[in-house]
Amino acid sequence: MTDQLTIAITTPLEAEHVATIRAVDPRITVLYEPDILPVPRYHADHTGDPSFRRTSEQEQRFLAMLAQADVAFDFDRSHLADLPVIAPKLKWVQATSSGIGQTIMRAGLEDSGIVFTTASGVHARPLADFCLMAMLMFAKDYWLMARDKAAKRWERYSGEELTGKTLAIIGLGRVGKEVASHGKKLDMRVVGLRRSTEPVANVDKIYARAELHEMLAEADVLVLIAPHTPDTEGMIGEAELAVMKPSALLINIARHQLVDEPALIRALQEGRLAGAALDVVSSEPLPPDSPLWDLPNVIISPHSASTVTQENARITAIFCENLRRYLACEPLINVLDTKALY
């Protein structure tokens, strides 16, 4: 390991977190110029204002910063495919997202020699909380309460409870395990699908991929958390939706490519599926003419289920731990497998 390490921060980051990174080791030099980065629109906004464009002078400064970097905290999507050229010293990138596999593949960086580490684990609790919110909103018929409130109508009704319902989870990584934990606290029956059939805490039964339809037929709630890979693309289509209960709820906090969206819309419109909570859709931002906006049994989240005010602090903690490991020539955590894409 060299005596000095230059880090370029390429995403908006609060000053206290920049200071935390600088304090990891005296051998570290941190390059951070907020004025050449997009202005964040909300806490932990890693892409910033989409209308932002660098001036020629700002672009030169940005490229000069990357040219010096041994390590980068996140990546700028406008300079991803050419990253090995403009940042020839770059050895490692710490991403601020968990699901970066497809992005790295599309940029042709899987064989670049650059190590990518992800923010895996940071978003587990917020995403699980989103699933819990969606399940309770449907069980307690939040929309009926909202309609009655708007009409100033007081009329008692009966809801459902989640106890004894079957929660099916596709993808039992950190997020899936957190969702399973929430389900068990509500005394739900929890089942899951994963590549390995090894037991998982809080999961009553593990299904193999060949048993997908069997699992779907049991599900009262289906949560999609698996990464987008060639194996998972389109895994929930017309045939899969057809075997689900008409009373079932589908929650997608993974990637939109896992679901055949037109088939999902038809199932919701025709009453073959009770509802959906979608943090991801095929076109983001969701266009005004999408039928999803008008479906009363759909929750739309603008890809924000994982975003909380504490996010940057948690990502910084992972990065700082990895910096200590990197300087000590120890294995990094959350390393992206550029072949499996997760």
Predicted regions and their residues:
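NAD(P)-binding Rossmann-fold cofactor-contacting core
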Residues: 35-40, 185-202
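Rossmann-like adenosine-cofactor binding region
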Residues: 196-291
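Short, conserved loop/helix-junction motifs that constitute active-site signature segments
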Residues: 82-89, 106-112, 241-246, 267-271, ...
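Oxidoreductase and adenylate-handling cofactor-binding alpha/beta cores
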Residues: 128-144, 185-188, 317-330
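N-terminal glycine-/charge-rich "phosphate-binding" loop or analogous flexible N-terminal tail
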Residues: 1-71
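Rossmann-like dinucleotide-binding domain for NAD(H)/NADP(H)
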Residues: 247, 253-342
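Phosphate/diphosphate ligand-binding glycine-rich loop within oxidoreductases
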Residues: 67-146, 160
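Glycine-rich NAD(P)-binding loop of Rossmann-like domains
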Residues: 115, 145-178
